[in-house]
Amino acid sequence: MNRCPITYELCGPRPYSLKGLRLLSPALKDLANLGLSAGELRVEAMARASKMSVQGVQPKLSAILNIKKGMFDIVDRNGRYILKPQHHIFPELPQNENLTMHLAATIGIRVPLNGLVYSKDNSLTYFIKRFDRRGQKEKIAVEDFAQLAGKDRDTKYNYSMEKLVRLVDDYCTFPSIEKVRLFNLVLFNFLVGNEDMHLKNYSVIVADGKVELSPAYDLLNTTIVLKEGAEEIALPLKEKKRNLTRNILVNYFGKETCGLTDKTIERSLAIIQAALPGWFTMIGISFLSEMMKDKYRKLLEERTRILFG
């Protein structure tokens, strides 16, 4: 029996569940494989890179959902989705990112619609709906924290979490609310081994007249992909990038730096702790290989012991 790569629910002989298809569009009856293989998608991404407004280490393509044809069409402009095919060096990034985004959603972290779609060679490609677009052509105002801090791609790691919190205070309409969201995201990224949350992976968005943190994106367990000796956080916290402790994460960052109350911190920790059993279940039914599932579980177990004892 197949499992839907959008919702993770069992879907019989079909490649996608009806629920998964309806998340993309209520009118979508089926979803065809992408017309290119993983290698061909990477070549296409390189050829179109200068036309993409969203760039990074992973190869990316802009796409629209063609409901009539029941498939994603790759486009140069006005795309509503981003496609990320398999990487030629780092294994299983699409499955990794999809799983990690699913885990984030279980604790209330806002994430855009995302999932996996089969390619011509049956490899899995990650898709995510753009949150900076509305309707056919309207762009929603979004700025990443590198822009807010006056940094660029070459200096996106030259900052600290303490300074990032000050940017939240300076730019967000209701910083006290956004600092709770930031705290939850930092705890989550520590637990799942996302050590690459540099300035360009945080953004603010104008929504309903308010400036707030954007939905989360680029969440994945980088620790199990990279070689040993990886750091635990991209931007130093209390001048540390590794050997983070509960005291640093909870008391120093949550209470002192973000100014959160004990009650707020306890609520965040309780929500995460209650979700942990479900996380291990979700890892088990994810589309990662058994080897990568095992690495993900072990890392999560290690980080859980640090945060919760």
Where would I find each of the regions flagged by the language model?
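A residue-level signal for conserved active-site and pocket-lining positions in enzyme catalytic cores
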Residues: 63, 104, 145, 196, ...
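A short beta-strand motif that forms the metal-chelation/ATP-contact edge
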Residues: 125-130, 215, 277-281
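Conserved ATP-binding subdomain of kinase catalytic cores across diverse folds
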Residues: 39-158
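ATP-dependent phospho-/nucleotidyl transfer catalytic cores
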Residues: 120, 127-191, 236, 251, ...
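Catalytic-core segments of enzymes that bind and process phosphorylated/nucleotide-bearing substrates
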Residues: 144, 148-167, 206-263
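Conserved kinase catalytic-core segment
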Residues: 89-105, 160-224
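Mobile late-domain/C-terminal helix-loop "cap" segments
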Residues: 238-301
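Regulatory N- and C-terminal appendages and interdomain linkers associated
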Residues: 1-41, 45-47, 210-211, 281-309
